[in-house]
């Protein structure tokens, strides 16, 4: 897969499918990007589980923090990595030992590791690198276009709210190739 660009349907398919996200490297500090993304995804209805060895046993926004992925007592759909690119391979290796395996490895902005991506894809996982799910969610739902940001999703209508569930905003049109 070309990890320099992703189709909207690929990203939309992931964000519409995953429900439980393990966020590796989330910070309890309110001024950190990982905290913003963690809070945003929680507010959109995702189950987000913080993973940070230095904060293990504590809580971030009411969610128990785990030291490592293997300690999480429930299935994970996506692993969102907020760590330096050099730290990605052991995180992917650990994710691949989970049963069931997660569906997606997502590496945040500036995080890329081609070897880890190939390893995850060889095991059947989808991979996204150098992207932020908060930004992608806002762009695809047209949510950020209402605050003056060009989301590349043109609409004269306010983003649709879905009420309760996995997400609060509809992520654009459904298509037959979502998830490809």
Which functions belong to the PLM regions below?
Residues 1-17:
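Short N-terminal or domain-adjacent regulatory/targeting segments
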Residues 3-7, 58-74, 80-90:
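Glycine-rich, highly charged phosphate/nucleotide-binding loops
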Residues 29-31, 39-59:
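NAD(P)-binding Rossmann-fold cofactor-contacting core
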Residues 54-55, 70-71, 108-112, 131-136:
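Short, acidic/turn-prone active-site loops that include or flank metal/cofactor-
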Residues 59-61, 76-77, 114-118, 136-143:
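Short, charged, surface-exposed secondary-structure boundary motifs
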Residues 95-123:
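ADP-ribose/adenylate-binding Rossmann-like module
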Residues 136-180:
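A charged, well-structured terminal subsegment
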